[in-house]
Curated annotation (Swiss-Prot):
The lineage of its organism: Eukaryota, Metazoa, Ecdysozoa, Nematoda, Chromadorea. This is Cathepsin L-like. It comes from Brugia pahangi (Filarial nematode worm). It comes from the Eukaryota. Residues 17-181 form a propeptide. Keywords: Disulfide bond, Hydrolase, Protease, Signal, Thiol protease, Zymogen. Its EC number is 3.4.22.15.
Length: 395
């Protein structure tokens, strides 16, 4: 596809050619349509109409070698134009399906981000077909966000004193028998201990959703009742303990809050996706804990033991890679992860016949993300994406 700059240059050159031929009025009409399409941001129509108009003029030049004929010759292969038409159709379908609305300038900006992400997902999926990676990707409702906008959702904020090598101990590290034989696979969803996947939206409240989900499973094991607990309660009411509302927080801090005050049900303290004044009352608190245990940072065997014997465990992972943002299926494995920045819930583990060991991880980006809201992350791959570096569970 010719760029705006290239088309403009051809227009200027063609102007001289038209002027010599005494066809200045015809060129004005061509450039008028060019201007209109440019202002509307319709690149496909711009290129197509501009070329068609020049072709109409060029056909009457009796085979003369002109700038117009040169332009027409260079643009005979319209494969890139077809690709642009395909992109614009996909983009229109995308924004329509999600009910997104942008003015023309913003629309072009967002479509460029969408295109970049589409190309990235296509590259990964090609590698999957070639057997080079163990997961697939697909565009989702995050496909038109800048990296900065997306990172707002990654709300795990580790305390400054946290040492991912295990030198810090805010609670007692989980103790377990390393020689104990554990089940080959565990999935707490099949035991009725996991509530449906929810969507945190644009608030950096992943820590609140992960903590609430862990407390739901804990309460189910203690009482036999599975309740939907309130992440909003945690977002609003743990700031005095050091969390930062929609700007992020830390799961153990939320567990400490639950042990002191209790957590309300979602129906009594519904999620709104923004920070509000704490509206906690003793009368609506339904679930408490007795503190929490942490996994020795980096110890995946300890994490496996805790998931098998104690229940779902909140984990901090590196979720900033675009490959993770658009994960769809398979066993996610990434060799170049950053520090933990996103809180999720490990609800089980297993082994894929082709791709090896994995963790079953519940996310809070809605069911359209990943495999119905879940990601299967590589296990026993050197603590991949720090999955065992900031893990804890209620007791």
């Amino acid at each position: 596809m010719w760029t705006i700059a290239q088309l403009a240059v051809f227009a200027i050159l063609a102007l001289a050619d038209f002027a010599v031929a005494g066809e200045i009025e015809q060129l004005k009409e061509v450039l008028g349509k060019f201007n209109k399409d440019y202002k509307q941001g319709n690149m496909t129509r711009l290129a197509s109409d501009f070329r068609s108009a020049l072709k109409e003029y060029g056909d009457g030049q009796q085979g003369e070698s002109t700038v117009v004929q040169e332009f027409l010759k260079k643009t005979e292969d319209n494969g890139e134009q077809r690709a642009m038409e395909k992109l614009e159709t996909e983009w229109k379908d995308y924004v329509t399906a999600l009910g997104k609305h942008y003015d023309q300038k913003e629309n072009n900006f967002r479509m460029a981000i969408f295109e970049s992400n589409e190309l990235m997902t296509e590259r990964i999926n090609k590698k999957y077909e070639q057997g080079l990676v163990s997961y697939t990707t697909a565009l989702n409702d995050l496909a038109d966000l800048t990296d900065e906008e997306f990172m707002v959702r990654n709300g795990l904020r580790l305390p400054n004193q946290t040492d991912l090598r295990g030198k810090r101990q805010t609670s007692e590290f989980y103790r377990y028998d390393k020689s104990e034989r554990l089940p080959d696979q565990v999935d707490w969803r099949t035991k009725g201990a996991v509530t449906p996947v929810r969507n945190q939206g644009e608030c950096g409240s992943c820590y609140a959703f992960a903590t609430a989900a862990a407390l739901e499973a804990y309460h189910k094991q203690m009482t036999g009742r599975l309740l939907d607990l309130s992440p909003q309660n945690i977002v609003d009411c743990t700031r005095n303990l050091g969390n930062n509302g929609c700007s992020g927080g830390y799961m153990p801090t939320a567990f400490q809050y639950a042990s002191r005050y209790g957590i309300a049900m979602e129906s009594r303290y519904p999620y709104v996706g923004t920070e509000q004044r704490c509206r906690w009352q003793q009368s609506i608190a339904v679930v408490t804990d007795n503190g929490f245990n942490e996994i020795q940072p980096g110890d995946e065997l300890a994490l496996k033991h805790a998931v098998a014997k104690r229940g779902p465990v909140v984990v901090g992972i590196s979720g900033s890679k675009r490959s993770f943002r658009f994960y769809k299926d398979g066993v996610y494995s990434e060799g170049n992860c950053g520090r933990p920045d996103h809180a999720v819930l490990a609800v089980g583990y297993g082994t894929h016949p082709s791709y090896g060991d994995y963790w079953i991880v519940k996310n809070s980006w809605g069911t359209d993300w990943g495999k119905d809201g879940y990601v299967y992350m590589a296990r026993n791959r050197g603590n991949m994406c720090h999955i065992a570096s900031a893990a804890s569970f209620p007791i």
